[in-house]
């Protein structure tokens, strides 16, 4: 290990290379070991000229994401590496381009607009839950994936005749994600991936996804139909000069919303159900709350009454944040907590570690939804980031939370869930996934 100028330990490229197989499979233990050894912030020399700093320090993270966010953009990990597979949109852009498109897309996710999508959500969720048979064991991860997939597909396109094409789109995004992870975690071998044609093969898949979406958009425009879905909202969105998005931009935004809109939700739902299965006391409290709610009336009103259900989801996302690492790159040299960091320093901020830090949380490894009942939720604002923070906070956070509250509420109103597992095995890819979540369902 090397000492940096400002006394921050630097993990050498040799150490990274020695641990490459572990890192490729699951980087979280490697992160944790280094945080335990070297403190809340350390550097990693990946051997390709990059300056990478890992941190779980709450003050540092708040400074980068909120207080001085103008000096920090998303790094090339997203704008270039991820962007080449899913296009240039809200998730993969910076600066003026991002600001203009955020202003265009944001209105589609206002609570007033989302109220019109709640019926679509509810119908999609109920339809998928019919697959659950009483007194059976299920791996809920694929089940939650199917629910989230149907919700985002119906909310985007409100059409039942697209299922086959949507499945193909899902296959492409999952395949490309695995390739992207290989590139990110093994930067030494990018030249080899290019030489073997692996990257080229996956870029062809991205082109197929774009062509598929282009066809769907053409069909919508040709039909002349007006539907109160997200695609319609994007088609009607206008720049300040009154012009619509270009076709390519529309395709990119739709692909990004599709990709980001179901995977993270499925992950959070799976972890929430597992934790409630492990903690029947909290599960029963959710059941009591849900039993008093009428889902056949005003769905927004129903969701607003499920506060403890929401607390359980919030606590699950603390322990298992879907976006477990957030990246930024500094535009100019900056001083953070008394230390100077050069321009172009890449910051990797571990939400997984921050959300389990004893200086921020009492009994951090314990599942305790009550912690989100007590006092003002703003007190967590400096160290709880399930949807990111600052101007780059996830545009779909309300959409995701409404959906998750409905799913958990509807399941636990009808079923008890149990588990024999003490812990769930995790699979950190672009988002934090469980490997499998086998639960026992029994009718109430």
Residue ranges and their predicted role:
Residues 2-100, 115-127, 163, 383:
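N-terminal membrane-proximal hinge/A-helix region immediately C-terminal to the signal-anchor transmembrane segment
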Residues 1-11, 73-79, 97, 113-267, ...:
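Cytochrome P450 heme-thiolate monooxygenase catalytic core
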Residues 19-42, 211, 215, 296-337:
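Conserved cytochrome P450 K-helix E-x-x-R motif and the immediately C-terminal K′/meander segment
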Residues 349-376:
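Conserved cytochrome P450 K-helix/beta-meander segment immediately N-terminal to the heme-binding cysteine loop
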Residues 264-289, 397-413:
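Cytochrome P450 catalytic-core helices
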Residues 111, 221, 225, 300-307, ...:
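Conserved, non-catalytic sequence blocks in retroelement Pol enzymes and Pol-derived host proteins
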């Amino acid at each position: 290990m090397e000492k940096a100028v400002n006394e921050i330990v630097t993990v050498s490229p040799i150490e990274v290379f020695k641990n490459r197989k572990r890192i490729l499979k699951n980087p979280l233990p490697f992160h944790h070991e280094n945080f335990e050894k070297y403190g809340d912030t350390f550097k990693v020399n990946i051997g390709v000229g990059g300056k990478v700093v890992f941190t779980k320090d709450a003050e540092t993270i708040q400074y980068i994401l909120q207080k001085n966010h103008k000096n920090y953009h998303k790094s090339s990990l997203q704008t270039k590496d991820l962007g080449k597979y899913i296009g240039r949109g809200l998730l993969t852009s910076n600066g003026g381009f991002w600001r203009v498109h955020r202003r265009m897309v944001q209105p589609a996710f206002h609570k007033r607009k989302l109220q019109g999508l709640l019926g679509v959500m509810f119908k999609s969720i109920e339809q998928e839950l019919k697959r659950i048979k009483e007194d059976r064991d299920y791996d809920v991860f694929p089940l939650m994936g199917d629910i989230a997939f149907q919700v985002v597909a119906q909310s985007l396109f409100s059409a039942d005749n697209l299922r086959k094409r949507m499945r193909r789109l899902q296959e492409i995004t999952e395949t490309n994600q695995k390739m992207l992870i290989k590139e990110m975690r093994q930067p030494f071998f990018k030249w080899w991936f290019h030489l073997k044609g692996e990257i080229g093969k996956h870029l062809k898949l991205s082109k197929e996804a774009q062509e598929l979406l282009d066809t769907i958009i053409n069909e919508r425009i040709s039909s002349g139909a007006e539907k109160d879905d997200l695609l319609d909202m994007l088609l009607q969105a206008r720049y300040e000069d009154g012009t619509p998005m270009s076709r390519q931009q529309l395709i990119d935004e739709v692909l990004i919303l599709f990709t980001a809109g179901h995977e993270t939700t499925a992950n959070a739902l799976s972890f929430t159900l597992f934790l409630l299965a492990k903690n029947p006391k909290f599960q029963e409290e959710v059941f009591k709350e849900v039993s008093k709610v009428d889902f056949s009336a005003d769905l927004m009103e129903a969701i607003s009454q499920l506060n403890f259900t929401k607390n359980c989801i919030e606590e699950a996302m603390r322990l298992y944040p879907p976006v477990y690492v957030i990246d930024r790159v500094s535009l100019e040299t900056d001083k953070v907590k008394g230390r100077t960091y050069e321009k172009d320093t890449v910051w990797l901020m571990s939400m997984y570690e921050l959300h389990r830090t004893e200086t921020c949380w009492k009994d951090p490894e314990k599942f305790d939804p009550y912690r989100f009942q007590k006092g003002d939720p703003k007190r967590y604002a400096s160290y709880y980031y399930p949807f990111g923070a600052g101007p780059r906070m996830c545009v779909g956070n309300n959409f995701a939370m409404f959906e998750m509250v409905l799913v958990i509420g509807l399941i636990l109103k009808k079923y008890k869930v149990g588990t024999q597992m003490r812990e769930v095995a995790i699979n950190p890819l672009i988002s934090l996934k469980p490997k499998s979540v086998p639960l026992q369902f029994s009718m109430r």
